[in-house]
Structures are given as C-alpha cells and as structure tokens.
Amino acid sequence: MAQSPLMIRAEGLVKHFGAVTALAGVDFSAASGTVLGLLGPNGAGKTTAVRILTTLLVPDAGHAEVAGFDVVRHPQEVRERIGLAGQQASVDEYLTGRDNLVMVGRLYHLSTRQARQRADELLERFELADAATRIVKNYSGGMRRRLDLAASLVVAPPVLLLDEPTTGLDPRSRMGMWSVIQDLVKDGTTLLLTTQYLEEADRLAGHIAVIDHGRVVAAGSPDELKRSLGGERIDVQIRDAAQLRLAEAAVARAVGRAPELDAELRRLTVSVSTGAQALTAVVRALDVEGITVEDIGLRRPTLDEVFLKLTGHEAELVGDPSEVREGA
C-alpha cells in the first residue's frame, strides 16, 4: 500500500532571536490526512515552528515545505493552502459571528453570496448558529475559539495549523474542540497541532514530536513513546507502613525483580512484562503475607511520564522567544 504524500515537512530548522536559540535543528513531518502533535511547554519552540510554516518567520537555517511548496521560496502558494488558528482568537469582537466569517470569505475573494453560504455552513458545524447575529464581544471563550477555528476553514484548506487551540478552555469546551478536530481529519485535512496538554496529544495525534529547548528530543506514535518507558507496571499502596519491607519482599518474589519504594506514600512500583499474570501473582503473594492493600493496579506509562523523563520537568508556562521578540 502506497504511503500518503507528505503535506508538512521540516528539516534542520534553526531560528535565533538575538542570543536566544528558539529552534536548534528541528525535523518533523506529517502525511496527508494525519495529525502531527508538537508537544512541549511554551518556550520550547513550538510557536516559532508554526510561524515558520505559515511564512510569518524566515528560518536562519534548514527548510520547510507545506503541501509541496517551500515556505521561503513560495510563500504565496503556501498561504493559499493553509489555515491557522493561534493561541488567541483573532476574530473582530465588534462584529457578529456571521459577519466575521463573511468578511474572511470576501478577503479570500468569495462572492458575497458564496461567503454568506459558507459562513452559515460553518456556524452550523461549530454549533454557533444560534449566536450568529450576536456581537463576538459577548461570546464565551469557547465560542470565540470555535469561531476562530471556523474562520480558518472558510476556504477549506488542505493543511490546518492549530497553535494550542484549547488553552484556557474549560473541559467541556475542550472536548467539543477535540470532536471538531477529529471530524476535520476524517474529511482528509492534515493537521499540525501544538499543545502542552498531554491528554490532548494522546487523544488526537497519530504522531508526536516532543520539543524541548528548541530540539526534538523524541518522536513516534503515542504508544511508541509510552513503550519507550518499559511497558506496563504494577502499583501497590499498602495500608500499614510497618509492612512496607515485607511487601517489598513479597512483590520481588512474585515478579522476579525488586520494586521501587515510596515510603511516604506507602507505595511500591515494579515494571512487568506479563501484565495480568504478574498482577495475579503479586495479589496472591501479598495475601499470603497478610498484607492489607489500599490500592493495586496494572498501569501503562502515560505521556505525562514520558514527557517528564525526556525533559526533566513538567509543562510549565513560559514565554516563547518568537512572541517576546514580536512584542518588543
């Protein structure tokens, strides 16, 4: 079976802002009709990469292509084939929702009739039809984000770049946005999604590139990244701290390796390769020793753990160098 053509490709991207290196040789790609997740804290270089792909920044080294066009040599062709929704909604808050979409359509040279028709289609699709005639200033944050995403789809671009589209949304609005994104992919759109929400990347992206300090520190599918931590593990929390050493010995006998201990939480953790079979053996061993268990379970590594292992820190909020430069 032939592979889908690459709709996004970046090779060796480098970008400096004064003494700050925002990108230090970044590579990634996305095939047609797939979702590529760029995962990392703000300041890692995600937004800088997006700004290069959308022709808003020129790389200092390396090159990138979108829909087969070089972003430096053919910027107009790239712009005609992309949609962009950034971290902040870019709609006009003093226009109605419908007027915002019609305006975007007219800027893309649609006729007034075509622009109105497309606006109504998108308002319906994004569940904004009832608010079509309301001033956007009175929209909720989730509604503004949906309208902003709708505006990026007025001309149905084959490539859509979403820069942290759900940051600041409540859980219900975030899940609604996820549903919209999944529908777009089903329709054949290629998406590049930057996010600091690990659950979001796990849910939406078929391939993830983890960026930290301007470098890709790992890449693969969510499952591949999780497996890189060593497969499944058994977590045990016992009731009586005095039994911790006894529990340690019992678990070690059951699975053939010593577990890691957290005395403060009265917890033992051990990696296993036989899954449910190992869990059954641990339960029996603890029962034989008369150890009271508060919680026990077989768990897979999470993207949170992958990210922490790769970067040494969690996804804290710091400024992106490209944004600092632009705002100076």
List each model region and its residues.
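ABC-family P-loop ATPase nucleotide-binding domain
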Residues: M1-V14, H313-A328
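ABC transporter nucleotide-binding domains
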Residues: P5-A10, K15-D212, V217-A218
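Hydrophobic/basic alpha-helical segments enriched in Actinobacteria
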Residues: V14, V20, G33, A44, ...
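Preference for bulky hydrophobic residues occupying beta-strand positions
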Residues: K15, F28, V236-I238, V270, ...
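ABC transporter nucleotide-binding domain
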Residues: S179-S273
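Topological signature of polytopic alpha-helical transporters
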Residues: A254, R267-T269, R284-E294, A315-A328
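Conserved short beta-strand edge segments in small beta-sheet-based binding/regulatory domains
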Residues: E260-L261, T292-R299
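Short proline/glycine- and acidic-rich turn/helix-capping motifs at secondary-structure junctions
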Residues: E264-S273, R299-K309
